[in-house]
Amino acid sequence: MVLIRVLANLLILQLSYAQKSPELVVGGDECNINEHRSLVAIFNSTGFFCSGTLINQEWVVTAAHCDSNNFKMKFGAHSQKVLNEDEQIRNPKEKFICPNKKNNEVLDKDIMLIKLDSSVSNSEHIAPLSLPSSPPSVGSVCRIMGWGSITPTKVTYPDVPYCANINLLDDAECKPGYPELLPEYRTLCAGIVQGGKDTCGGDSGGPLICNGQFHGIVSYGAHPCGQSLKPGIYTTVFDYNDWIKSIIAGNTAATCPP
């Protein structure tokens, strides 16, 4: 069974795959408190349900399938029980999804750009992560992070974000496990071939950081998470650089690559 990595209380789409319930990084450890300064917690009245990445003081990138009504974003968070003094909360002022996205295909152009209602300030636990300067290289060691469940089959939510190292894999290593993937979806395949480390449900929208660069957005994967031969699927950020820059520059009619 395959799920998109979102909330448990969202309705499951009756498609060839289902949306993922919120779970966290499986096979990881608690993140260092200072290593996830760009990680954004997206939440509503039910709690955290997605993550995002701060790319400058006014803009966040996440997955399009994380879009919902009445959500807020928390910056500088680590423990859900012990607040950092520099935590900041913002509302979305504007949300941008590719106008040429195929609405009936969740994997297609699974990226959303959010303008904040006011800018955030850099601090000890808050700093943006810039867009990638070049495409990622197969074999790169990549970092994943999030507040999702730390167990693959039942929901076990941690109070802190978990992190893990995985590898960027060749698309050919993903195709057998995900025959529905199409080249035009512009995705990356990353994980551990033998399984055991993976993003999961509530990690949707969070970053895949390879060699210090923001290369992917958590999008899609198998359920249970962390299966062998079924790595995670991530939206390729580099392919959307021009669209993101155009929107930020004020060209709100810009379209994404086909």
Curated annotation (Swiss-Prot):
Point out the glycosylated residues in this chain: 44
The answer on whether this UniProt entry bears the keyword Ribonucleoprotein reads no
InterPro entries from the xrefs?
Peptidase_S1_PA, Peptidase_S1_PA_chymotrypsin, Peptidase_S1A, Trypsin_dom, TRYPSIN_HIS, TRYPSIN_SER
Question: Which residues does the propeptide include?
Answer: 19-24
Per the record, the domain of life is: Eukaryota
Subcellular compartments: Secreted
The protein's GO terms of the molecular function aspect are: serine-type endopeptidase activity; toxin activity
Q: Which ranges carry the Peptidase S1 domain?
A: 25-249
Entry's family note:
Belongs to the peptidase S1 family. Snake venom subfamily.
- Protein name in the entry: Snake venom serine protease PA
Q: What is the species of this protein?
A: Trimeresurus stejnegeri
